[in-house]
Amino acid sequence: MNNNEWGLVTIPANIDPEQRAIARLKIASEMSLKNYGTPLVVTTSGGKDSSVCVEMAQRAGIPFEVQHNHTTADAPETVRFVRQEFARLENLGIKCTVNYPTYKGKRTSMWGLIPQKLIPPTRMVRYCCEVLKEHGGDGRFVCTGVRWGESARRAKMRGIFEKQVKDRDKSVKVHEDGGSLEELFAPCKLKAKHIVNPIVDWTTSQVWDFLRDSKVPVNPLYECGFDRVGCVGCPLAGKKRYREFNYWPAYEKLYICLLYTSDAADD
């Protein structure tokens, strides 16, 4: 692997997906240390893709931290799994941090946001993601488990390396391992959030094959038949959220209660 200071990222074309992901992480780590003076931040949601990224960072032999954004709407099993994983990683000397959401300068939650927004999250109005899931990371180089295979939108909108700014039209994405990093990491751009998605081109089958072969700990909800472990009742889950509400009825009651509260506030 050869990485020119502001030029092309060169990763051999004939390496396997695991080694390719590790190579991407090493490039991101080098850029993080060089430009920010801080280790790469590996984010974890408690899902399978995050588990792959944490394991890959360990195999890459790079310095890194792990951060989790506490959404307040995750399943209890997910919260416990993240705590257990953080305890395991901290025993290995890896710094782990839980970030709590804020809104207008104050701590908040999904259940605090809905009354302020006067509407629960919908497929078209997902204010919750920005506040609860995507906060943090400014001025740092961040690793996520985003994959193109998750949705057509992600296949179109996400890259291997990214520079994210508030005006998304001005964001920069590198979609190929031979892409230039010059625009991505120009000194004037360092206040943006920089992201590496090392397994962005992996399939779901590749993710599960890696986890099983490597015996990496995974969220126990997968063993219960769930294929996603995000926020309970997320509108993007479609009809699957009704199964989630059956499994965790307290969440459905909260949404319904706050929905009626919001309606009453409009009257």
Model-derived segments and their meaning:
Residues 1-262:
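Nucleotide-activated chemistry modules centered on ATP-dependent adenylation/adenylyltransferase
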